């Protein structure tokens, strides 16, 4: 047993210190970034935000809606090959370039992903997703995927420490997904005692990944556009959002009605709800590590997307960053004990 004494921080523990700026307007800020990925050699340009690969967020409808904002969607892994074919037939090349194909690590997952990728060469992203990215089996699967799809951009996770981030990049991942337990409907930290405050995880993993020419995506923990700005300020190349994009018309959750008001169900992918839906229930050897919540219907996702992008532009103007790429170089975090005046929060 050992204890690390240095304090680890989440997004709620800091604010970004304002700095002098020559920008005259938020409209002067360029949010689009251009990337060339280490292993695939592929280039991509767009706004580096990703809708999470949850079946109540990462839907085909969400992908179509967010593509118009130049935002990526990691489409969840529970669509059939036939459903993928129908989506591809009805989607433009511009939509498909904003899509990630998600997969687990079983042999069946691998074969299904291969079939999906063979449907259209415009599908250039693969998101290999497990709750615990520290297993040797996962690393081997990433290497297998890289060998099978040398020109596809592979995003793999989740991990929260630099050494594992390096391991995944060396095994073939272009982007490492960072985050264990920070999600709004994730209970891993409560059920297992395992986790890592998200901002510190982002800072440390970004440092490790960038040293090898890789990239990271901060996955989880964002509750406001300000948190998205903090993730980019901490060094994240991409930011993945789940709860912030849930509850919309495009989110795909089941709608329930209580006392005349409609709600949409949103649940973690390790929750009892998810496991009942996709694998018949919670296996006797494990515990559910997610929860189910009812969200008031939030309308089209376009309004939320505009709010997030507007907040990002404003954050950049406060620190004098004319491009999103400059935000991390212009960011100084200050530790705080409060984030906002909450006097009217319950009204």
From Swiss-Prot:
<keyword id="KW-0479">Metal-binding</keyword>
<keyword id="KW-0560">Oxidoreductase</keyword>
<dbReference type="GO" id="GO:0005829">
    <property type="term" value="C:cytosol"/>
</dbReference>
<keyword id="KW-0521">NADP</keyword>
<keyword id="KW-0630">Potassium</keyword>
<dbReference type="GO" id="GO:0042802">
    <property type="term" value="F:identical protein binding"/>
</dbReference>
<dbReference type="InterPro" id="IPR005993">
    <property type="entry name" value="GMPR"/>
</dbReference>
<feature type="binding site">
    <location>
        <begin position="108"/>
        <end position="131"/>
    </location>
    <ligand>
        <name>NADP(+)</name>
    </ligand>
</feature>
<feature type="binding site">
    <location>
        <begin position="216"/>
        <end position="239"/>
    </location>
    <ligand>
        <name>NADP(+)</name>
    </ligand>
</feature>
<comment type="function">
    <text>Catalyzes the irreversible NADPH-dependent deamination of GMP to IMP. It functions in the conversion of nucleobase, nucleoside and nucleotide derivatives of G to A nucleotides, and in maintaining the intracellular balance of A and G nucleotides.</text>
</comment>
<feature type="binding site">
    <location>
        <position position="183"/>
    </location>
    <ligand>
        <name>K(+)</name>
    </ligand>
</feature>
<comment type="similarity">
    <text>Belongs to the IMPDH/GMPR family. GuaC type 1 subfamily.</text>
</comment>
<comment type="subunit">
    <text>Homotetramer.</text>
</comment>
<feature type="binding site">
    <location>
        <position position="181"/>
    </location>
    <ligand>
        <name>K(+)</name>
    </ligand>
</feature>
<protein>
    <recommendedName>
        <fullName>GMP reductase</fullName>
        <ecNumber>1.7.1.7</ecNumber>
    </recommendedName>
</protein>
<feature type="active site" description="Thioimidate intermediate">
    <location>
        <position position="186"/>
    </location>
</feature>
<dbReference type="GO" id="GO:1902560">
    <property type="term" value="C:GMP reductase complex"/>
</dbReference>
<dbReference type="GO" id="GO:0003920">
    <property type="term" value="F:GMP reductase activity"/>
</dbReference>
<dbReference type="InterPro" id="IPR015875">
    <property type="entry name" value="IMP_DH/GMP_Rdtase_CS"/>
</dbReference>
<dbReference type="GO" id="GO:0046872">
    <property type="term" value="F:metal ion binding"/>
</dbReference>
<dbReference type="Pfam" id="PF00478">
    <property type="entry name" value="IMPDH"/>
</dbReference>
<dbReference type="GO" id="GO:0005737">
    <property type="term" value="C:cytoplasm"/>
</dbReference>
<dbReference type="GO" id="GO:0032264">
    <property type="term" value="P:IMP salvage"/>
</dbReference>
<dbReference type="InterPro" id="IPR013785">
    <property type="entry name" value="Aldolase_TIM"/>
</dbReference>
<dbReference type="InterPro" id="IPR001093">
    <property type="entry name" value="IMP_DH_GMPRt"/>
</dbReference>
<dbReference type="InterPro" id="IPR050139">
    <property type="entry name" value="GMP_reductase"/>
</dbReference>
<dbReference type="GO" id="GO:0015951">
    <property type="term" value="P:purine ribonucleotide interconversion"/>
</dbReference>
């Amino acid at each position: 047993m050992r204890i690390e004494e240095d304090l680890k921080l989440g997004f709620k523990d800091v604010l970004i210190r304002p700095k002098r700026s020559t920008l005259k307007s938020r409209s002067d800020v360029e949010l689009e970034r251009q990337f060339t990925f280490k292993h695939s050699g592929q280039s991509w340009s767009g706004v580096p935000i990703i809708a999470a690969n949850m079946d109540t967020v990462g839907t085909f409808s969400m992908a179509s809606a967010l593509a118009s904002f130049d935002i990526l969607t990691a489409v969840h892994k529970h669509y059939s090959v036939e459903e993928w074919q129908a989506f591809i037939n009805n989607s433009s090349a511009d939509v498909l370039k904003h899509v990630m194909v998600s997969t687990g690590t079983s042999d069946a997952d691998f074969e299904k992903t291969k079939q999906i990728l063979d449907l259209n060469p415009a599908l250039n992203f693969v998101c290999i997703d497990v709750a615990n990215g520290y297993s040797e089996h996962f690393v081997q699967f990433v290497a297998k995927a890289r060998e099978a799809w040398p020109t596809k951009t592979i995003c793999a996770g989740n991990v929260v420490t630099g050494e594992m981030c390096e391991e995944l990049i060396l095994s073939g991942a272009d982007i490492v997904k960072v985050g264990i337990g920070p999600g709004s409907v994730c209970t891993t930290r409560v059920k297992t005692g395992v986790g890592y405050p998200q901002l510190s995880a982002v800072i440390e993993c970004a440092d490790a990944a960038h040293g090898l020419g890789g990239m990271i995506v901060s996955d989880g923990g964002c509750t406001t556009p300000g948190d998205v700005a903090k993730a980019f300020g901490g060094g994240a190349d991409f930011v993945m959002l789940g709860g912030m994009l849930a509850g919309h018309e495009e989110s795909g959750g089941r709608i329930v009605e209580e006392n005349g008001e409609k709600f949409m169900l949103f649940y973690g992918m390790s929750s009892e709800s998810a496991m009942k839906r996709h694998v018949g229930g919670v296996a006797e050897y494990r515990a559910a590590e997610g929860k189910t919540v009812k969200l008031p219907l939030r309308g089209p996702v376009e309004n939320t997307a505009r709010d997030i992008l507007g907040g990002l532009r404003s954050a950049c103007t406060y620190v004098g960053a004319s491009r999103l790429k400059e935000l991390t170089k212009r960011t100084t975090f200050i530790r705080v004990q409060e984030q906002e005046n909450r006097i009217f929060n319950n009204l």
